């Protein structure tokens, strides 16, 4: 049976874990060393926010009183023609060397007073993503339908599961571009984990797995490692952020191109969202994610660009990733 949380009260929910009764908020990753339960959110740009909660229970997402859905037209930070130009500029940079893949994103926004807890409750019913999560405290509210694992940690064992490759149905086949993209990011994540793991412990136990998700199929791989003794959460996050799947390869070059060519900061989109409890953790990549800033609700969508990308097809992929969730939350894309 669903519990009921006071409207507007700080809370966190992910995978049947409900956290309530906020104790403190921190912007310093060293707070995670105290061994307590923290819900965390980082932005793509690296801003860290964490909330410590007193009461942790295993239960369904709390019941939400029905309110108005989002209505109206969502506006994109980048038009179709502008996005196509962005993709072509990335392809030019790939042709000149120095970068192999860049994740090209855009933000869609709408002015709305609708609450994201109702949006999240509807997402859980109609789009039950494996890493769906909800976080609300102080001025932050996030409702995520993420399909992608940023990391799990169990003592000294760590795993990341990057997604590269998206198609509409399980009957279609992933193309060479999808497989090449995924392998590039697997190599990148092996390198990132190598900064914090025992030499020789990095493994790829599952490569190019076809996963079905609500309305979509994704190509997923697992990369694992054994953490070095004494490694801190601050060191882990520094080594791995931002996620390779939403930046590109090489990561440093892709980040420079994104900063140069994308018209708005990504913010919550493409950061991470989840929980840390001592040496245990589940963190998702904050894709398929809604978040509130003042009077506006935002949603991000993007596609991985390689030399073989077709710019118009990449735009259509960003539409595909957005359309199902927008139909659930409300408004017109």
Residue ranges of each PLM-predicted region?
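Extended alpha-helical targeting/anchoring segments
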Residues: 1-333
């Amino acid at each position: 049976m669903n519990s009921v949380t006071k409207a507007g009260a700080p809370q966190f929910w992910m995978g049947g874990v409900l956290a309530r009764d906020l104790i403190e908020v921190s912007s310093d990753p060293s707070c995670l060393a105290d061994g307590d339960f923290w819900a965390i959110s980082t932005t793509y740009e690296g801003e860290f926010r964490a909330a410590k909660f007193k009461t942790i229970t295993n239960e369904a997402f709390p019941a939400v009183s029905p309110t108005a859905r989002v209505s109206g037209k969502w506006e994109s930070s980048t038009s179709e023609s502008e996005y196509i130009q962005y993709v072509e500029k990335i392809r030019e940079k790939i042709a000149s060397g120095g970068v192999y893949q860049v994740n090209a994103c855009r933000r869609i926004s709408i002015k709305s007073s609708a609450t994201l807890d109702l949006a999240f409750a509807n997402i859980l019913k109609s789009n039950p993503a494996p890493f769906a999560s909800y976080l609300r405290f102080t001025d932050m509210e996030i409702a995520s339908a993420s399909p992608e694992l940023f990391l799990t940690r169990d003592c000294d064992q760590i795993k990341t599961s990057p997604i590269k490759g998206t198609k509409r149905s399980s009957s279609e086949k992933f193309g060479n571009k999808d497989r090449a993209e995924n392998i590039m990011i697997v190599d990148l994540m092996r390198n990132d984990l190598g900064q914090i793991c025992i030499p020789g412990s990095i493994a790829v136990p599952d490569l190019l797995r076809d996963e079905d998700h609500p309305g979509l199929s994704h190509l997923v791989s697992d990369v694992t490692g054994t953490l070095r003794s004494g490694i801190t959460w601050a060191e882990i996050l520094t080594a791995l952020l931002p996620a390779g799947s939403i930046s590109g390869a090489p990561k440093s070059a892709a980040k420079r191109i994104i900063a140069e060519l994308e018209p708005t900061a990504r913010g919550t989109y493409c950061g991470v969202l989840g929980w840390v409890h001592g040496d245990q953790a589940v963190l998702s990549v904050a894709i398929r994610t809604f978040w509130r800033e003042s009077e506006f609700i935002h949603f991000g969508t993007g596609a991985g660009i390689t030399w073989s990308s077709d710019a118009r097809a990449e735009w259509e992929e960003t539409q595909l990733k957005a359309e199902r969730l927008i139909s659930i939350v409300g408004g017109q894309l």
